[in-house]
Amino acid sequence: FVQHSRKENFYQGILLGILSYKSDWIVRSNRESGEGFSDITIRISNSGTGIVIEVKYAEAGHEEEMVQKALRQIQDKDYGYEFRQEGIRRILYYGIACNKKVCRAEVLEV
C-alpha cells in the first residue's frame, strides 16, 4: 500500500476483500491516476461506470472532516482522469473515514 498509515491500510484491505467478490467488477488498489495514486478504483464491466475510493483514518469525532478531506483529495489529484481517458462517463467518488467500528462515507457523482 502506498504512503498510508497502518490504520488506513487495515480499512483499505477490508474494503478490497469485500469489493473483489463481484465477478463483473475490476478492482484495483493504489493505481496511478491524475496527480497521484488512488486507494481503490473499480471499473464495472459493461456499465460505463467507474468508482474511485479514498480511505482515511479519523480520530474519534473527526469522521466528517476526514470524509471531506478524502473527497477533496480525489478531486484535487484528479483520480478520475484514467476513467475519463477511457471514455467512462459515469464516475462515482467515495470518501470514506473510519475510526475503530465507526465509518462514515459520502459519494459524489461526477
List PLM regions with ranges.
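Structural signature of nuclease core domains in nucleic-acid processing machines
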Residues: 1-110
